[in-house]
A protein has these predicted regions:
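Short intracellular "coupling" helices and adjacent cytoplasmic loop segments at the cytosolic face
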Residues: 88, 96-126, 202-226, 317-328, ...
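Membrane-integrated ABC transporters
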Residues: 1-33, 48-66, 79-83, 87, ...
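Juxtamembrane loop-to-helix connectors within ABC transporter transmembrane domains
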Residues: 4, 12, 79, 83-84, ...
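Cytosolic ends of transmembrane helices, especially the final helix of ABC transmembrane type-1 domains
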Residues: 196, 219, 243, 291-318
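ABC-type nucleotide-binding domain
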Residues: 334-573
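An intracellular "coupling" helix at the cytosolic face of ABC transporter transmembrane type-1 domains
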Residues: 10-17, 107-108, 124-140, 185-202, ...
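Transmembrane helices of ABC transporter permease
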Residues: 14, 18-31, 61, 65, ...
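Hydrophobic alpha-helical segments in the permease module
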Residues: 65-76, 172-180, 245-259, 278-300
Length: 573
């Protein structure tokens, strides 16, 4: 348990003053709760003396005491708001830290955690009651306040009547037994609930991402059935948690009421026998009533802690996942004059898939087509060249420098990458092209024109808004925005992963014509399944079953390589 509190307390360090302020409000709140019954105890026991003629000073002091207690209660009223503020701040910082750590991960991480699961961990696990944000401040400080009230109230009650205090606390051992019996079962149910939530998010994410396929195959009923089964399972788990919590709270309330009835009955006898005063009985009853909330709050801390700790484990699981290997290269490129593969290869962990044995040297300016059947390692090869995947064997050199020795930031400056799926964001076309690089409008417009998507053809120019995933424009326009993003930085190395697949023949031809007309020294690697695209290239890298089969011009390979001809005939359009 201590490891969780150490993890939480590190967020307190950035809010020391606010934490001290909360501690002060906690003390004020507990003190006010303690003082109020004592003032009325005094009033009940001394009402005749206070109201008697000539006792104006005593009456004035009593009014001042009541005023002070009232003012203190007003100050203590800021307590929930102060807790809520720190809840929000901690939630924001935890999410920011987790998101920053996620951005440092590599392919191993994203093959293990799906988008829906990650979204759940960064939202529900952090901000939903009673998860990390609420528990880190409100949960802990409420427990501290309740513990303070418990200690203070019990102290005063023992001072007034130790015997009556002992009798009123008879239900306490039963409460502890209930907590012990339910604590482990509740923790197990909470973990099951979090996993069910992540599974639901994953299903929704994959459904919305592939909605076109689902509609095309009329698979709506199948997806609805999967969701219904997941929700039924999740509902059963959540109901079991709710039942456990209801049983705990109900039993605690009943036992608390038993204690109050005991005080009224036995306390009345004590008053009749002059063992305590009527003011003592009033104060005693109020203190016991005040104890009921702490006696629920403190066990509730353990209940909510199970849920919060499960969420902390889930957030820490993604934060503590090993990051991508540190690339400590510092060498600069400036431009890209050549790329050389030296028996380069990459194998995905736990399987033989990937690409191996790639050897060849390519000099700028040149267009290189990467060709092969589905699953031959084409996309893997360009991801290796972009630095997304490390070479597990051999090496890749840029300008004669091993890729691992190149400054990663410098490599990104000279590289333009277009993935198979045009990943666009819910923002304007201009911001999608800039991608935080602070480019002038003229630079963005030039890149769009080069991708054959002039800004003037868009409804609102650069400010044209795109929906989720680039919705609102055609598939060809989305791909051209992605190409413009890659070209906007004037890269010397362009990596196009089947990016012309969504373009018709005329659009693709205009793209290549525009790149040639612009001139400049560019080394372009383009993964393609189109023979028309291959014809635009100077050289072809032909991969077959994950191994380099041949390198040559399209005409040479057609003439000399039977496997190439077969793949061209069966896999390419």
């Amino acid at each position: 348990m201590l490891k969780y509190f150490r993890w939480i307390f590190r967020y307190y360090r950035t809010h020391r003053l606010h934490t001290v302020f909360l501690a002060l409000l906690t003390l004020i709140s507990a003190t006010v709760a303690l003082a109020f019954p004592l003032v009325f105890r005094y009033l009940l026991d001394n009402v005749q003396e206070v109201l008697a003629p000539g006792s104006e000073d005593r009456f004035l002091k009593l009014l001042l005491a009541l005023g002070a207690v009232g003012f203190a209660r007003m100050v203590a009223g800021f307590y929930p708001g102060a807790r809520a503020w720190l809840n929000s701040k901690i939630g924001m910082e935890v999410r920011d830290d987790a998101f920053g750590e996620i951005l440092k991960k590599d392919y191993r991480f994203f093959s293990k955690f799906g988008p829906g699961d990650l979204s759940t961990r960064l939202t529900d696990d952090i901000v939903e009651y009673p998860r990390i944000a609420w528990f880190s401040c409100s949960g802990i400080f409420r427990a501290v306040e309740s513990a303070s009230r418990l200690v203070f109230c019990l102290g005063v009650m023992v001072f007034m009547s130790a015997e009556l205090t002992l009798l009123s606390l008879v239900p306490l051992p039963i409460m502890l037994w209930i907590f012990y019996r339910t604590e482990r079962k509740l923790g197990k149910r909470v973990e099951e609930s979090r996993k069910a939530t992540s599974s639901t998010s994953d299903l929704l994410d994959s459904t919305f991402a592939g909605i076109a396929i689902i509609k095309a195959y009329r698979a709506e009923k199948g997806q609805s059935g999967r969701l219904r089964r997941l929700l039924d399972s999740r509902l059963a788990i959540d109901l079991s948690i709710t039942k456990l919590v209801m049983v705990i709270e109900s039993l605690y309330s009943i036992l608390g009421e038993v204690g109050k009835v005991t005080v009224l009955f036995l306390g009345g006898l004590f008053v009749i026998r002059d063992r305590i005063s009527i003011g003592d009985l009033y104060a005693f009853y109020v203190y016991l009533d005040m104890l009921l909330a702490p006696m629920i709050d403190i066990p509730n801390l353990f209940v909510t802690s199970k849920q919060a700790f499960a969420s902390i484990d889930r957030v820490r699981e993604v934060m503590d996942f090993p990051p991508a290997p540190e690339r400590s290269g510092v060498r600069k490129l400036g431009s890209v004059d050549s790329v050389e593969f030296r028996n380069a290869g990459f194998r995905y962990p736990g399987c033989d898939a990937g690409v191996i044995g790639v050897t060849g040297r390519f000099e700028s300016p040149m267009t290189v087509a990467v060709v092969g059947e589905v699953g031959s390692g084409k996309s893997t090869l360009v991801k290796m060249l972009s630095g997304q995947l490390p070479c597990t064997e051999g090496d890749i050199l840029v300008n004669g420098i091993p890729l691992m020795e190149v400054d990663p930031s410098d490599l990104s400056l000279v590289t333009g990458y277009v993935p198979q799926e045009s990943s666009l964001f819910s923002d304007s076309v201009g911001e999608n092209v800039r991608l935080g690089r602070g480019m002038e409008d003229q630079t963005v417009e030039r890149a769009l024109a080069l991708a054959d998507l002039p800004a003037g053809d868009l409804p609102e120019g650069l400010e044209t808004k795109l929906g989720q995933g680039g919705s609102g424009v055609s598939g060809g326009q989305k791909q051209r925005v992605a190409i413009a993003r890659a070209l906007a930085g004037d890269p010397g190395l362009c990596l196009f992963d089947d990016c012309t697949a969504a373009l018709d023949a005329d659009l693709e031809q205009r793209l290549w014509d525009g790149l040639r007309a612009e001139g400049g020294r560019r080394l372009i690697f383009v993964v393609t399944h189109r023979e028309a695209t291959v014809r635009q290239s100077d050289l072809v890298i032909f991969l077959h079953r994950g191994i380099l089969n041949a390198i040559g011009t399209h005409e040479e390979l057609l003439r000399t390589n039977e496997v190439y001809r077969l793949v061209l005939a069966t896999e390419m359009s």
